[in-house]
């Protein structure tokens, strides 16, 4: 079945690389996983000699990389999914493991929801998470790309995929990763990525929320652990500006965290 898929798509002009498994090591501990991935990569090389192979890791764990070097020599490019606090360490981990082939960052973005515990002010007493503002995320995306991806081209980094280029439909917090809202309007992170890729911002910029003090409920910020009573009246306030001077329309949504 896999070979049939390769034969079907190997000459498609949109095909760049064959990715064998996405974060497979997160679900399996048996080292035979890498033998299986290598067997698939070998089959792909025999069936389609014109496209490289990769496998995608959930982190740049040195031991996992060493296992791939030893057991999966038919992997041409290593792909890593990683987020704000861990991205700077990827290149060092690759070098420590002895990886000498190219690599890609196949997911990057702000601090993940599972990475908030080191920042206690971002975790509320009942376990809820304090999301970054769209402007804070914009800064994180731009910094991540400029300081850890673009600068490492000569160190084997082929490029990256920003997460998530679209409307987010999964995760604990509905607006955590998506760079677009449900209607297709952009968040500032889209501006950041266009600037990172082209050196110019888009002509029509996304609205800006300057500081955390510009998003309040009953005069408090989210990290103030706001508690409200059932059937009570509460006031939410957001202060936003548009870099282009466009008029803004405000849509309020109340969403349950998963």
At which residue positions do the language-model features occur?
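Active-site mouth of glycoside hydrolases
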Residues: 1-75, 81, 88, 99
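A conditional alpha-helix N-cap/helix-loop micro-motif detector
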Residues: 34, 84, 138-141
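Conserved protein kinase catalytic core
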Residues: 62-63, 87, 113, 170
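Short, acidic/turn-prone active-site loops that include or flank metal/cofactor-
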Residues: 82-85, 108-110
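Substrate-binding clefts and catalytic carboxylate motifs of secreted carbohydrate-active enzymes
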Residues: 95-257
């Amino acid at each position: 079945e896999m070979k049939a898929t390769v034969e079907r798509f190997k000459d498609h002009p949109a095909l760049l690389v064959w990715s064998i498994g996405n974060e497979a090591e997160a679900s399996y501990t048996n080292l035979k996983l890498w033998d299986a991935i290598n067997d698939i990569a070998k089959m792909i090389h025999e069936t389609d000699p014109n496209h490289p192979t990769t496998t995608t890791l959930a982190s740049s764990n040195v031991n996992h990389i060493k296992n791939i070097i030893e057991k999966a020599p038919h992997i041409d490019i290593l792909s890593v999914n990683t987020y704000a606090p861990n991205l700077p360490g990827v290149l060092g981990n690759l070098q420590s493991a002895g990886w000498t082939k190219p690599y890609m960052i196949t997911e990057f973005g702000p601090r993940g929801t599972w990475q908030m515990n080191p920042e206690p002010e971002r975790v509320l007493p009942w376990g809820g998470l304090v999301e970054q503002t769209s402007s804070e995320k914009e800064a994180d995306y731009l910094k991540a790309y400029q300081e850890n991806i673009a600068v490492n081209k000569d160190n084997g980094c082929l490029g990256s995929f920003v997460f998530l280029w679209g409307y987010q439909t999964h995760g604990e917090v509905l607006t955590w990763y998506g760079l677009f809202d449900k209607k297709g309007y952009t968040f500032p992170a889209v501006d950041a990525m266009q600037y990172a890729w082209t050196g110019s911002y888009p002509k029509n910029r996304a609205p800006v929320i300057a500081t955390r003090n510009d998003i309040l409920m009953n005069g408090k910020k989210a990290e103030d652990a706001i508690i409200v009573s059932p059937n009570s009246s509460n006031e939410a306030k957001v202060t936003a500006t548009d870099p282009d001077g466009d008029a803004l329309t405000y849509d309020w949504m109340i969403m349950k965290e998963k």
